């Protein structure tokens, strides 16, 4: 009988419960315990049949865990991540890695110095659609990629903000909450970001953050492209509504990413390639063809990958260093928007 990887879950909020649901279905992992100071978490633990603890220290000392999933508020990630690292326990830390690049660097350095694996929960990288898109771009099928456009237009209703007041506070706008996913995927496909130019518009609902942002990114591969994000636009063009990852979002047949190469273009997530038949040119006929793939749940893929990381079979697909790089770009967006200047990423 296969030995299951024993996991503990810290934080039983919305994403924490989603992790629990996935682990309970996993063929490679077993959820042993959960920890959360909220009393409702104990009822949840009893409901799903696992041990309950009020904090991480108790869970680690009282359970024989192979790994821990950290799904707590961003400002607690550095404290909880360091505790796992100091105990020699691999962790999967939800995105973003920390509330600042400085805190992310502390986690990244500690993980490296102690030789303890940290996987950052940018789960979309585990989607077969993204794996296929990266391969198409890397293969040269559309030639040298010169530019891209990414769209993340959503309309979050008032009740979304009423449920959790922190969503109205500074640092909880669509750039931090939503765009960080797109930054990670674009870095994964296009390379490292070297400079950022950005404009943001203050929330019309009176929140402390932005509700619209446009960003120009330049990569070390000489790719330049734009991202537009908003949580106040009704549209079908976002990863949530196009990728069909989460059944909570009604699916559309649209795309949200466009990659333009000198031999063709690629739309994602539908993986449609547009190319001229023979001679390239704007007067020449252009046809499309779709790549077909077998889709699987990226959250389940992430848990399976975490198990492989714990066993030492694979390095983390999104290491703490990768999480740090995403936060540097994120902070660069805010710096550029505030100063009106191009911000160089170092």
Predicted feature descriptions by range:
Residues 206-210, 220-301:
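NAD(P)-dinucleotide binding in Rossmann-like oxidoreductases
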Residues 106-124, 143-149:
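Rossmann-fold dehydrogenase core element
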Residues 124-208, 213-217, 340:
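Predominantly a Rossmann-like dinucleotide-binding segment in NAD(P)-dependent oxidoreductases
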Residues 1-48:
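N-terminal Rossmann-like dinucleotide-binding module
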Residues 19, 37, 48-110:
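Beta-loop-alpha module in the N-terminal Rossmann-like domain of NAD(P)-dependent dehydrogenases
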Residues 54, 93, 118-120, 149, ...:
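Hydrophobic residues in well-ordered beta-strands that form the structural core
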Residues 1-4, 67-70, 268-269, 305-346:
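C-terminal helix-rich "cap/oligomerization" subdomain common to oxidoreductases
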């Amino acid at each position: 009988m296969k030995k299951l990887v024993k996991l503990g879950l810290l934080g039983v909020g919305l994403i924490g419960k989603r992790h629990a649901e996935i682990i309970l279905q996993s063929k490679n992992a077993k959820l042993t315990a959960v920890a959360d100071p909220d009393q409702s978490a104990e009822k949840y633990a009893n409901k799903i049949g696992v041990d309950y603890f009020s904090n991480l220290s108790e869970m680690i000392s009282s359970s024989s865990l192979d790994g821990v999933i950290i799904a707590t508020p961003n400002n607690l990630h550095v404290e909880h991540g360091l505790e796992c690292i100091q105990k020699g326990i691999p962790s999967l830390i939800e995105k973003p890695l920390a509330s600042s690049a400085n805190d992310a660097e502390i986690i990244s350095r500690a993980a490296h110095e102690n030789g303890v694996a940290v996987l950052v929960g940018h789960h979309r990288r585990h989607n077969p659609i993204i794996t296929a898109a990266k391969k198409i771009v890397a293969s040269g099928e559309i030639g040298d990629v010169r530019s891209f456009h990414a769209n993340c237009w959503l309309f979050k209703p008032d009740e979304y903000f009423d449920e959790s007041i922190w969503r109205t506070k500074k640092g909880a706008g669509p750039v931090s909450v939503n765009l960080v996913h797109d930054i990670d995927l674009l870095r994964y496909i296009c390379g490292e970001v070297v400079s950022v130019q950005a404009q943001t518009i203050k929330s019309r609902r009176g929140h402390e953050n932005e509700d619209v942002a446009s960003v120009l990114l330049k990569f070390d591969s000489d790719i330049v492209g734009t991202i537009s994000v908003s949580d106040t636009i009704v549209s079908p063009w976002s990863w949530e509504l196009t990728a069909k990852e989460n059944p909570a979002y009604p699916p559309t047949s649209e795309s949200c990413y466009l990659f333009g190469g000198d031999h063709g273009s690629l739309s994602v997530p539908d993986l449609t390639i547009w190319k001229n038949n023979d001679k390239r040119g704007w007067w020449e006929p252009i046809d499309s063809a779709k790549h077909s793939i077998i889709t699987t749940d990226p959250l389940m893929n992430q848990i399976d990958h975490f198990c492989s990381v714990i066993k030492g079979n694979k390095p983390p697909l999104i290491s703490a260093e990768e999480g740090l790089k995403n936060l540097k770009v994120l902070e660069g967006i805010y710096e550029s928007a505030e100063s009106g200047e191009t911000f160089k990423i170092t």
